[in-house]
Amino acid sequence: NANGEYQVETRKGWDELTFSAVGYISKTVRVGSNNQTVNVKLAPDNVLLNEVIVKPQKEKYSRKNNPAVEFMKKVIEHKKAQVLEVNEYYQYDKYEKMKMSINDLTPEKLEKGIYKKYSFLRDQVEVSETTNKLILPISVQETSSQTIYRKNPENKKTIIKGKNSNGIEEFFSTGDMLGTVLKDVFADINIYDDDIRLLQQRFVSPIGNNAISFYKYYLMDTLMVNKRECVHLTFVPQNSQDFGFTGHLYVLNDSTYAVQKCTMNLPKKTGVNFVNRMDIVQQYEQLPNGNWVLADDDMTVDLSWNSNKTAGGLQVERTTKYSNYKFDPIEQRLFRLKGSVIKEADMLSKSDEYWASVRQVPLTKKESSMDVFVNRLEQIPGFKYIIFGAKALIENFVETGSKGHPSKVDIGPINTMISSNYIDGTRFRLSGMTTAHFHKHWFLNGYGAYGLKDERWKYSGTVTYSFNKRDYVVWEFPKHYLSASYSYDVMSPMDKFLFTDKDNIFLSVKTTTVDQMSYMRDATINYELETLTGFGVKAMLRHRNDEPTGKLEYLRNDAAQTRVHDVTTSEASLTLRYAPGESFVNSKQRRVPVSLDAPIFTLTHAMGFKGVLGGDYNFNRTEASVWKRFWLPASWGKIDCSVKAGAEWNTVPFPLLILPEANLSYITQRETFNLINNMEFLNDRYASMSLSYDMNGKLFNRIPLIKNLKWREMFRVRALWGTLTDKNNPFKSNNPDLFRFPTRDGKFTSFVMDPKVPYIEGSVGIYNIFKLLHVEYVHRFTYRDNPGINKNGIRFMVLMVF
């Protein structure tokens, strides 16, 4: 191995061993017939070699009549027999250690700068067991779990028995974010799947159903692996910049064609970002019943911003050991536990004795003393200010506590403290929220804002009771709470479609003037429940007063065009949501899905009550939506698909009609229309569709010069079908309860769609520019004669992906 350790099994008549290595003088030693330890040191061979440049001829690879390809077809054909799911039941134990370290350290670096000034940093340095390089561990996380499976009816659950973490994540209140993201990015690998989910991407498995067309295979040798005869093959992607691996397969040379060992790496010219090196080693073992199962799954990844490592980097090591495979019937009560992942109540408080019993790989000396290292870090002068700034930047909030006295109140979001809009002008806002250190069940949040232009105060306050104890914020999964809120603020109709806060300073710059707004006074009671299966219910009661302002007026559809000062509604709504397998990272501002692989189904119905608490209208609105991501085979990228439909069943004025999901900022956002103006189309029946195709660089990777930039391409199309029935159309009805459509300077700014002509916009984008920037050109294909519209535009987004 990398440490020079070896083991050789001798046979009768063998009495000598010869040791050789490139650049060293060979040495022969005598050995006996008994077990013995032989340590050998080779002397360097100081021979100066002349430079030789080898330029291979371009390879002509053919799948036809290729023995390696024919052999791999048999491996793929037999792989179903090796998956655990062929058994009626199975269970196994799993131990995982995830370590993050600063890498690329050298003896020279350790004698300079901060390492020279603080000796405890040098004391924390160790040699990586996988790369043989100097590293400085900064985080270690251990997880002990048990997985159980039942075939009929199919059910699979993972029971987390213990979790243990030490390191820099202790400095962050949402420290579980690091562990959650690391586990998702460096996920478990099953080469028997067609695609391997890794780095939040999909890689083609070397034994996947599409592998023959994606990889080149080469037969190398027949050799013994763990006393079993195996066929050794190597594989490389047809195009090294596609999302695939290079590596070695060791397949049993018998009728099972089972994989006994697999090593995988990323190609040197890979299109993957931030990864300079990745080593994956999997070992399989045979059980007494003949099954071959995964025993070891180890991964080492070197990360840095650029490939030449001038900025330094990190190393992530994931060590995973599987044991105690069993195929006996399992107690049925375990399958009745809620959720696919069950966390034992004492998983965070397991004893040292417990970890010693389940830890199949001992901690290194530096890993064991991680808590001491963290304490020494805190003693560095000025370190707390560095952490304070880093937390404010990453979490977008400022804490009011300290390590000994955790924050009970956080100030933020920081990016909403100053913004601007047409009514407020320059707007200043101060926001805050209590945390679980204030109370595990009761939470408060709110803000106060002031606009220099309209000289009005705006405010919002919310009181929430969580039925579940929370660790830090109220929206941790699964949510179960009751809240009451009251707010008074200025809003545009499209603000409700934003995924982020409407006062985000980066959204202040619009592609067109948004001058049709309202002062909204809301009183809301909200109940929300989520289950571990991904099912959620949200029930809401809301009383709203809507006072138009700016260039927005409410004029009755009568001869006098009577001005309406405001509209009051009293409504109740119920939303059902189902997203099986969805997982989240908790930030202080909101929950963020770890990945977007889970399908999402929603159904909402809202009812308005005329005469209840001053409500002006009855209304009934129903909306449904489906969102799904589809990964294409053979590294052809992914398609995100969204379909929505809805209807307003009653006669209502235009503020209560259904608006398109418009986004008039320069920041692109999923599922919104970039070129539809504020309230441009008013419908009481609609259907919309969004398709986004991310090719992951499949085209650019085949264009000379361009492929060196590692740019990636994407295509998007969005469509909206809508209609307005005569009863809600002020141009076809004399009903005075309706309002005239909005105008600006005497010209209408809202329109009725032709039910036979959908609104369509498309975009072509390039992302991964400098590994950071997403640029998208958007074009409007229909309704191009509407006044005041943009027919095309450029949109941006900061996007970091592997």
Q: Where are the model-predicted features located?
A:
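Extended lipid/amphipathic-ligand handling interfaces
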Residues: G247-N253, D279-N289
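Periplasm-facing N-terminal accessory domains of Gram-negative outer-membrane beta-barrel systems
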Residues: N1-E51
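Short, hydrophobic/aromatic-rich segments at coil-to-beta transitions
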Residues: Y89, N226-T234, A258-T263, N291-D296, ...
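Short, solvent-exposed aromatic-acidic interface loops
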Residues: M264-T270, D298-N306, Y486-S487, A645-E648
